[in-house]
């Protein structure tokens, strides 16, 4: 990408599978960035549950073929849903939009076998909205010997320059991105080569285990403001066992929510389970921060953001 400023819509649906985040920005992809619009569009209850059910069915590569009919059906629905979002935004900004970044909905991710599957038909979306669509981000990263995740560090690299200038925060600058999976980025300096200037990795679960526990044990979808976790008590024995069983030994592989589950909290009350799972999640994020700052040669300020 040259130094030209592009106006783009980016659409992302994370592992919570509850809806689509849409952002309209203007950027050259290097050091200039302006936010124009951020919106959230929630999936209806039926689509949300069907997505969760489908993801639970897909346990291996063979299942992608086994459930191909259901995958194709929901993929079309997902694509049309994204198209409606773009058309709504385009009513205000149509003549300014250069391209669309379309992530889709991940239902299976296994970088070890070089497989990742996102629901979303980029070609159909382009036909629906009559605009250029960039898609298959994770597949292309894996084809080029990447892990397919995390992808946000490229954006963190750009934003770090803005933060450095506006807020006078010195490099290196860290980002803790807590989505379904948590990932940590460290941007080393302002003008480094992007391939050498970023240290980034998945650190463990973000909201995925907490959300799973809430969905299984209540009619809620998530722990709003952490109120449920605040009302319970940590079961230290179970927490220690979970840490021993799940602690990340290496940060060179991307993670999927299927790398973790809430089975270790079975038998606990709803509140105590939520509290213990939340502390387990926080512990792994803290260990990731410790690893990110392993040389301890410079103080790093970390910005916490949600996925």
Predicted segments with their positions:
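Glycine-rich phosphate-binding loops at beta-strand->alpha-helix junctions
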Residues: 107, 299-307
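Short glycine-aspartate micro-motif
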Residues: 8-12, 97-101, 172-177
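Conserved non-catalytic scaffold segment of RNase H-like nuclease domains
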Residues: 34-75
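N-terminal beta1-alpha1 ligand-phosphate binding loop
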Residues: 8-24
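Conserved nucleotide-sugar donor-interacting segment of glycosyltransferase catalytic cores
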Residues: 115, 121-135
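A contiguous, well-structured pocket-lining segment that forms one wall/lid of small-molecule binding clefts
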Residues: 219-301
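Glycine-rich phosphate-binding loop plus the immediately following alpha-helix
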Residues: 20-27, 36-53, 128, 134-162, ...
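Short beta-strand-loop/turn "lid" adjacent to the catalytic site in phosphate-handling enzymes
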Residues: 61-122
């Amino acid at each position: 990408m040259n130094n030209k400023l592009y106006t783009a819509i980016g659409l992302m649906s994370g592992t919570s599978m509850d809806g689509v985040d849409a952002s309209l920005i203007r950027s050259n992809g290097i050091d200039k960035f302006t936010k124009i619009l951020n919106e959230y569009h929630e999936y209806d209850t039926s689509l949300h549950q069907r997505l969760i059910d489908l993801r639970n069915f897909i346990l291996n590569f063979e299942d992608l073929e086994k459930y191909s009919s259901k995958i194709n059906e929901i993929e079309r629905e997902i694509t049309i849903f994204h198209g409606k979002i773009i058309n709504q935004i385009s009513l205000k900004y149509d003549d300014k939009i250069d391209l669309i970044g379309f992530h889709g909905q991940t239902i299976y991710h296994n970088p070890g076998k070089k497989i990742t599957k996102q629901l979303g038909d980029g070609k159909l979306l382009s036909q629906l909205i009559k605009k250029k669509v960039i898609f298959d981000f994770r597949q292309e990263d894996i084809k080029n010997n990447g892990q397919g995740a995390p992808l946000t560090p490229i954006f963190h690299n750009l934003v770090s320059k803005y933060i450095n200038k506006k807020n006078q925060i010195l490099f290196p600058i860290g980002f803790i991105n807590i989505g379904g999976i948590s990932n940590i980025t460290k941007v080393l300096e302002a003008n480094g080569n992007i391939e050498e200037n970023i240290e980034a990795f998945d650190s463990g679960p973000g909201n995925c285990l907490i959300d799973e526990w809430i969905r299984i044990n209540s009619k809620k979808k998530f722990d709003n403001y952490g109120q449920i976790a605040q009302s319970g008590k940590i079961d230290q024995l179970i927490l220690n066992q979970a840490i021993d069983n799940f602690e990340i030994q290496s940060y060179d592989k991307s993670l999927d929510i299927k790398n973790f589950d809430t089975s270790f909290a079975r038998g606990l009350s709803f509140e105590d389970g939520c509290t213990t799972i939340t502390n387990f999640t926080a512990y792994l994020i803290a260990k990731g921060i410790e690893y990110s700052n392993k040389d301890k040669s410079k103080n790093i300020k970390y910005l916490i953001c949600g996925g």
